[in-house]
């Protein structure tokens, strides 16, 4: 028998009592802890990035960093670490953060490092991902080349009527609220955070799907068509599921993804394909002369149908569906949130707001909303927008990773396949590039000889350290359209209404998930008409 031998008795003793007189599970725990301690020691002292400063404890556990990420407060944590360690630090050994302007331009523009895999987790399928979520540089290059004409100056002008129509509905709703008030000149409260989010989605509905989502109308009219009323919630759920799946790898392939947002958007894309194919079949050789709706969806549908079947890079209907949904992700709350934050900054700086009002002529509430090509030159408004984008970038960081080869950043060798994030927020608040970085100071974006700079001259902005739309080949392709939208909405609002603060500054908090957003989805302002209502 085995137990009668010396070896057999030893095995039996280990089974019964464990090694060193301890239970087996306790020995396994000790072994795990020792192994973890060794890995932490190796990461902290022996890794190729060991000379880069950073929190020591994160080499043994990333739980604190994960806690901040899950709560959406990692941006604040990263800011504090940049203040402590400077323009370059590491979280553990595989995550680097950099806030130096030259280093960021090196990573984003010169080397054009690929995005981290977190972006791919946001896509429905990485094989058909759009420009925002793809991590494949070659695929992105081909899609960028395809999409660029749809965001060129001339094409953007063709989209102006859709932008005007959606904006008109918002300000008609505001006008109706004023008319219903018992005292038109008693301040009314507008939750601009949600109002502007609805406006941005309506604009994207018009330009990317050919219909208005009618979200603005749903806020004031109980009888409005509410078919798309939940699209913001469905989009948020879609993104939330993608983020969760990223942290559950490799089991993410067994997790079901919420794709209900596609149930709303796919029929719109399919209908446009059917219309275009039928129109082309009926028109024959004269198809090019048939009038069509000139929007982004039509551009993509035409491009898809015109691509040769034998091409290696195809633009299928699935590609178009995914790209249109990604336009909602990248162009929705990014613009609307920025407008809200600019209003917040102006209300916290009454002298700047008063100065801005001096440059904008008042308008009646029932005037037609001017298109962005009809707006007058507004240098001080432009400076206020730029300063707002500096202080409130749409994302606190841009995640990239090194490829198969190492790269050198600020004299440090970064090994292959290491995540390295460009800290845009830390860059925009660096006293190295910005005098009084915590001060809202629009004059820094004006020429020194500008009449608007005379009363409060500021050091000139360092435009190389100003990256609200990113930089390099993967910068925001819709930056011109977003700029026009911000100017148009802000000019119309301030021309018609006098705004005043309602929210206490210390009660407004932020979260960073996909974009920089308010912790509580509400920012109210008080408004009164600048001109008397017509009888």
Swiss-Prot record:
Q: Which Pfam families match?
A: p450
Recite the UniProt keywords alphabetically.
Glycoprotein, Heme, Iron, Membrane, Metal-binding, Monooxygenase, Oxidoreductase, Transmembrane, Transmembrane helix
Which residue ranges does UniProt annotate as crossing the membrane? 19-41
Per the record, membrane topology reads: Single-pass membrane protein
SUPFAM superfamilies reported for this sequence = Cytochrome P450
* Localization terms from the record: Membrane
Q: What is its main location?
A: membrane
Q: What triggers expression?
A: Expression is strongly induced under conditions of nitrogen starvation. Expression is positively regulated by the cluster-specific transcription factor rua1 that recognizes and binds to the specific 5'-T/G-G/T-C-G-C-A-T-A/T-C/T-C/T-G/A-3' upstream activating sequence found in all promoters of the UA biosynthesis genes.
Q: Which superkingdom?
A: Eukaryota
Say if the entry is tagged with keyword Iron: yes
Q: EC number(s) in its UniProt entry?
A: 1.-.-.-
Q: Which PANTHER family does the record cross-reference, listed alphabetically?
A: CYTOCHROME P450, CYTOCHROME P450 12A4, MITOCHONDRIAL-RELATED
**Designated name of the protein:** Cytochrome P450 monooxygenase cayp2
């Amino acid at each position: 028998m085995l137990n009668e031998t010396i070896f057999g008795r030893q095995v039996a003793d280990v089974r019964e009592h464990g090694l060193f007189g301890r239970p087996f599970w306790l020995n396994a725990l000790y072994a795990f802890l020792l192994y973890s301690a060794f890995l932490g020691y190796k990461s902290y002292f022996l890794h190729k990035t060991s000379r880069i400063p950073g929190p020591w404890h994160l080499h043994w556990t990333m739980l604190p960093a994960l806690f901040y990420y899950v709560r959406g407060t990692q941006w604040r944590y990263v800011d504090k670490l940049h203040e402590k360690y400077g323009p370059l630090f590491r979280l553990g050994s595989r995550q680097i953060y950099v806030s130096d302007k030259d280093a960021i331009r090196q990573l984003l523009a010169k080397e054009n490092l690929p995005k981290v895999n977190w972006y791919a987790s946001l896509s429905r399928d990485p094989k058909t991902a759009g420009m925002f979520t793809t991590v494949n540089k070659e695929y992105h290059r081909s899609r960028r080349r395809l999409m660029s004409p749809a965001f060129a100056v001339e094409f953007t002008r063709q989209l102006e009527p859709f932008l005007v129509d959606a904006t008109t509905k918002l300000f008609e709703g505001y006008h109706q609220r004023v008319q219903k008030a018992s005292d038109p000149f008693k301040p009314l409260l507008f939750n601009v955070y949600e109002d502007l989010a609805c406006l941005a989605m309506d604009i994207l509905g018009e330009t990317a799907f050919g219909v208005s989502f009618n979200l603005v109308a749903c806020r004031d009219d109980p009888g409005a068509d509410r078919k798309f009323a939940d699209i913001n919630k469905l989009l948020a759920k879609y993104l939330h599921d993608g983020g969760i799946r990223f942290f559950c790898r490799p089991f993410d392939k067994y997790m079901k993804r919420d794709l209900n947002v596609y149930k709303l958007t796919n029929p719109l894309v399919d209908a446009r394909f059917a219309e275009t194919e039928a129109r082309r079949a009926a028109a024959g050789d004269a198809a090019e002369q048939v009038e069509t709706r000139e929007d982004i969806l039509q551009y993509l549908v035409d491009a898809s149908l015109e691509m040769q079947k034998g091409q290696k890079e195809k633009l299928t209907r699935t590609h178009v569906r995914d790209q249109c949904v990604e336009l909602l992700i990248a162009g929705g709350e990014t613009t609307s949130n920025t407008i809200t934050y600019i209003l917040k900054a102006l209300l916290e700086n009454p002298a700047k707001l008063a100065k801005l009002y001096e440059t904008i002529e008042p308008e009646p509430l029932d005037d037609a909303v001017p298109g962005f090509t009809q707006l007058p030159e507004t240098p001080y408004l432009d400076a206020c927008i730029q300063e707002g984008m500096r202080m409130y970038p749409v994302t606190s960081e841009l995640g990239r990773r090194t490829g198969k080869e190492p790269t050198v950043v600020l004299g440090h060798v970064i090994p292959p396949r290491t995540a390295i994030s460009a800290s845009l927020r830390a860059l925009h608040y660096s006293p190295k590039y910005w005098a009084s970085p915590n001060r809202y100071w629009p004059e820094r974006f004006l020429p020194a000889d500008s009449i608007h700079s005379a009363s409060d001259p500021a050091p000139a902005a360092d435009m190389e350290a100003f990256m609200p739309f990113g930089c390099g080949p993967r910068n925001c392709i819709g930056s011109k359209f977003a700029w026009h939208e911000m100017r148009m909405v802000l000019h119309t609002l301030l021309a018609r209404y006098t705004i005043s603060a309602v929210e206490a500054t210390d009660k407004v908090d932020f979260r960073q998930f996909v974009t920089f957003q308010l912790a509580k989805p509400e920012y109210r302002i008080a408004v009164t008409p600048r001109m008397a209502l017509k009888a």
